């Protein structure tokens, strides 16, 4: 007998066929899953549980058993039996039945699958449309099993055919997985219509709509044939353009013929002529009447219609082949149909039905109804406006929440407080015009000049002093309130800045070292002098009235201004002031000095007390508690001249004071060098402390103004190169110190070494106490223990960098004299690195 040869249909015996034979795979499809696995991140190597649906003959299970980790669970299912495979569980079942689900759950217990594979296909051969739909149904059933058994973030790989259900399946995949891609591996034949879809990142929804996996819902046809209607319209109104394009429509389901006909009378009576003209090939005329047949209505109607003028021989020839007609011929057929329907009365019947059902006329509205309707419209508009405002408010609130979450804490309320106050307090001409006082109001001093006639009529000008005082009080109160609001806003700004900036918090904690200590209150005659100046100005001004000048003098005679009185009244120190205690303190300070000076001070204080008692006794009746001042350094030196203990105490005080000083700035280091080298002494430092910024008046000034002035009211002190180098070296020493984590790690390492040493000591003691061993054996065992203690970790070999120049240029192998790992570098790589940095810097901007 001759040798039987295998058929080479569709190139089945290609190189993958022979490779599968060599590798021992059961089918050439093994290389499909291998190529998919390599393309999509080696997901099989990370899978502990794998399910292979429609696994026969088991080639994909073979690949999974080789690539998956050891002791992985691999389950293969198919409707046909599968020969046993090592490390693979196989059973025979239909994946569309409940039996398959229960058996899968029995094998998996409480586990979830990391990967589900599906390479199944139905028995093909019935028809392409039917085969593709069956494959889509099978894929949906496999997806249903995968959804039940996949873990969150799992992978699903399936085979599908490109058909009209492909997009529906892809939409379902995208609802359940984060990443969905279609691919065709090289091992798949080009003539095959199969493609593979890889779905990664299973979302694992808690609730799943059952319609998402129902074939009736997923593969439901949408549109209702609108596309065919549009195509038919194109065939009728633009047949030349439509006929020039290739139509890849195929056959309709259940209709596998290309030639369609219809009786002419049915075409006339139907309501969709365009669709019929586009889909039919021919209209059949009524057959001649036989003697055996009864009278037919269609024959009678056609006899009437055949006598029309539009029923020409050309028309009868055109209806025999509709596919070759143009726009002119189709219009002729439609005109004939319209005339035929008019003669047969088909359109008249429809008009009569419309006449039987007359249209309902709307009666005009009355005046009251119109008013009610307008009111209702206004109410509806108001509701819509309120709804819109509410929506805008919600949007603003949402934006504010987002701004707070992103730490965009810019104060948007700056100026609102001032606007609320100023809107009522500012002068407005409109309000003055409404009250009729606009003509009486004047601007500046010119309108305050009185004419001689007016003075003759009114010899005495009566001005209510209480009204003037009230106006002054109101304006002063407003100014005080504005100042308080500015102070509050500045404090809020400081609090916000302290929350954001740690350096600012530290600066606030340290305080301002430049601020001088408060040494009490000295009497000042600034207010009196200002009152005198004001008096001189009022006398020199000829335009002012004498009565107004007298009132101004009376107001200026007060000892303190309003702000000063508020300051002294708010401070508890001045409320508790006692003159007797002050006198005692002055006596103690001036003891041993000239007695006349003491007596003069006492007399002066007594006179001041008498004057103040006549004025305001209630404000100064409280007590004042004074803490005695510390003794000066000179007094301490005088008193402790003969005592050694005091000398020791002073030296300890000076040493502690020196320890607190930290030379952290270049200016401080420069000053320390100058003092140490004798370039400056104590008196030079005192002279430098007196400058144009030393005695600047800061009383009654707001904090925000003082803080802003401090930034600029500073002397720039000279520095030296040696001081800068010293500070730099100091910073280097600080930076050289390891961080806290490194110190903790080193201490933990030492602690572990000490623990190991303690263990070795205990073991060595036990070895020494063992009398059954010789001294040599004891020494050997103890030396072995010490070797374990001193054992160091292996260091990784360093990579040697070899420059490709000279003899190494163009070298393909290992350079001479280089051992271990090495890396070849050249000038091109350096230029490339520079270019990459330059590009990154460019796009960073």
UniProtKB/Swiss-Prot annotation:
Keyword Methyltransferase in record: yes
Gene Ontology BP terms: maturation of 5.8S rRNA from tricistronic rRNA transcript (SSU-rRNA, 5.8S rRNA, LSU-rRNA); maturation of LSU-rRNA from tricistronic rRNA transcript (SSU-rRNA, 5.8S rRNA, LSU-rRNA); rRNA methylation
Cell compartment(s), UniProt = Nucleus, Nucleolus
Q: Name one GO molecular function term.
A: rRNA (guanosine-2'-O-)-methyltransferase activity
Q: Which InterPro entries match?
A: RNA_methyltr_RlmE (IPR050082), RNA_MeTrfase_FtsJ_dom (IPR002877), rRNA-MeTfrase_E (IPR015507), rRNA_MeTfrase_SPB1-like_C (IPR012920), rRNA_MeTfrase_Spb1_DUF3381 (IPR024576), SAM-dependent_MTases_sf (IPR029063), SPB1-like (IPR028589)
Compositional bias per record (Basic and acidic residues), positions renumbered to this chain: 496-512
What is the protein name given in its UniProt record? Answer: AdoMet-dependent rRNA methyltransferase SPB1
Its source organism is Candida albicans (strain SC5314 / ATCC MYA-2876) (Yeast)
Taxonomic lineage of the native organism: Eukaryota, Fungi, Dikarya, Ascomycota, Saccharomycotina
Q: Which gene encodes it?
A: SPB1
């Amino acid at each position: 007998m001759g040798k039987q040869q295998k058929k080479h249909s569709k190139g089945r015996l290609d190189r993958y066929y022979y490779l599968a034979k060599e590798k021992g795979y059961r089918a050439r499809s093994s290389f499909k899953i291998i190529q998919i696995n390599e393309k999509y991140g080696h997901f099989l190597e990370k899978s502990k549980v794998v399910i292979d649906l429609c696994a026969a003959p088991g080639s994909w299970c073979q690949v999974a058993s080789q690539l998956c980790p050891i002791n992985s669970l691999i389950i293969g299912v198919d409707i046909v039996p599968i020969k046993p495979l090592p490390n693979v569980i196989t059973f025979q079942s239909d994946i569309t039945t409940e039996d398959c689900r229960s058996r899968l759950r029995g094998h998996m217990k409480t586990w979830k699958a990391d990967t589900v594979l599906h390479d199944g296909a139905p028995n093909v051969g019935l028809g392409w449309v039917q085969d593709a739909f069956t494959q889509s149904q099978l894929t949906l059933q496999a997806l249903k099993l995968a959804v039940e058994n996949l873990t969150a973030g799992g992978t699903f790989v399936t085979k599908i055919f490109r058909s009209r259900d492909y997009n529906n399946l892809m939409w379902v995949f995208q609802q359940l997985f984060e990443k969905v891609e279609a691919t065709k591996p090289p091992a798949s034949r080009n003539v095959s219509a199969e493609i593979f879809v890889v779905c990664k990142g299973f979302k694992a929804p808690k609730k799943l709509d059952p319609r998402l996996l129902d074939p009736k819902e997923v593969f439901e046809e949408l549109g209702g044939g609108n596309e065919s209607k549009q195509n038919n319209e194109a065939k009728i109104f633009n047949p030349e353009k439509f006929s020039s394009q290739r139509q890849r429509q195929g056959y309709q389901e259940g209709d596998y013929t290309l030639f369609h006909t219809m009786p002419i009378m049915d075409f006339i009576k139907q309501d969709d002529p365009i669709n019929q003209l586009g889909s039919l090939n021919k209209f059949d005329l009524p057959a001649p009447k036989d003697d055996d047949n009864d009278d037919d209505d269609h024959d009678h109607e056609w006899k009437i219609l055949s006598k029309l003028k539009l029923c020409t021989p050309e028309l009868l020839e055109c209806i025999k082949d509709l596919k070759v007609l143009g726009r002119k011929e189709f219009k002729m057929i439609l005109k004939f149909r319209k005339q035929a329907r008019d003669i047969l009365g088909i359109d008249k019947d429809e008009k009569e039905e419309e006449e039987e059902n007359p249209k309902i006329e709307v009666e005009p509205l009355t005046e009251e109804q119109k008013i009610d309707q307008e009111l209702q419209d206004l109410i509806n508009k108001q509701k819509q406006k309120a709804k819109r405002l509410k929506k805008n408010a919600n949007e603003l609130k949402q934006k504010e929440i987002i701004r707070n979450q992103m730490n965009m804490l810019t104060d948007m309320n700056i100026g609102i407080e001032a606007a609320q106050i100023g809107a009522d307090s500012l002068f407005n001409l409109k309000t003055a015009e409404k009250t009729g006082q606009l003509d009486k109001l004047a601007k500046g001093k010119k309108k305050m000049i009185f004419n001689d006639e007016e003075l003759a009529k009114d010899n005495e000008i009566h001005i209510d002093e209480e009204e003037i005082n009230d106006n002054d009080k109101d304006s002063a109160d407003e100014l005080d309130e504005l100042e308080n609001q500015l102070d509050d806003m500045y404090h809020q700004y400081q609090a916000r800045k302290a929350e954001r900036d740690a350096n600012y918090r530290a600066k606030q904690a340290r305080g301002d070292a430049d601020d001088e200590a408060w040494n009490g209150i000295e009497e000042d005659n600034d207010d009196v002098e200002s009152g005198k100046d004001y008096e001189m100005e009022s006398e020199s001004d000829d335009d002012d009235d004498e009565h107004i000048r007298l009132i101004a003098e009376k107001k200026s005679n007060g000892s303190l201004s309003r702000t000063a009185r508020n300051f002294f009244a708010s401070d508890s120190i001045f409320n508790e002031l006692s003159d007797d205690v002050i006198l005692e303190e002055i006596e103690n300070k001036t003891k041993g000095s000239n007695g006349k000076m003491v007596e003069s001070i006492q007399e002066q204080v007594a006179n001041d007390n008498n004057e103040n008692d006549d004025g305001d006794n209630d404000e100064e009746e409280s007590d004042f508690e004074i803490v005695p001042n510390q003794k000066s350094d000179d007094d301490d030196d005088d008193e402790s001249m003969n005592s050694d203990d005091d000398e020791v105490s002073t030296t300890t005080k000076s040493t502690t004071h020196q320890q607190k000083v930290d030379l952290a700035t270049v200016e401080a280091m420069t000053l320390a060098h100058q003092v140490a080298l004798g370039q400056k002494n104590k008196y030079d430092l005192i002279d430098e402390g007196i400058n144009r910024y030393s005695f600047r008046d800061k009383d009654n000034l707001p904090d925000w103004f003082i803080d802003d002035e401090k930034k600029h009211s500073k002397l720039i002190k000279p520095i030296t190169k040696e001081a800068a180098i010293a500070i730099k070296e100091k910073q280097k020493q600080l930076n050289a110190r390891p961080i806290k984590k490194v110190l903790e790690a080193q201490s933990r390492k030492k602690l572990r070494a000490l623990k190991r040493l303690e263990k070795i000591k205990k073991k060595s003691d036990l070895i020494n106490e063992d009398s059954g061993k010789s001294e040599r054996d004891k020494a050997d065992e103890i030396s072995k223990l010490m070797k374990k203690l001193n054992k160091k970790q292996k260091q990784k070999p360093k990579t040697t960098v070899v420059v490709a120049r000279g003899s190494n240029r163009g070298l393909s192998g290992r350079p001479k004299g280089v051992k271990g790992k090495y890396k070849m570098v050249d000038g091109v790589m350096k230029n490339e690195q520079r270019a990459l940095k330059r590009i990154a810097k460019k796009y960073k901007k």
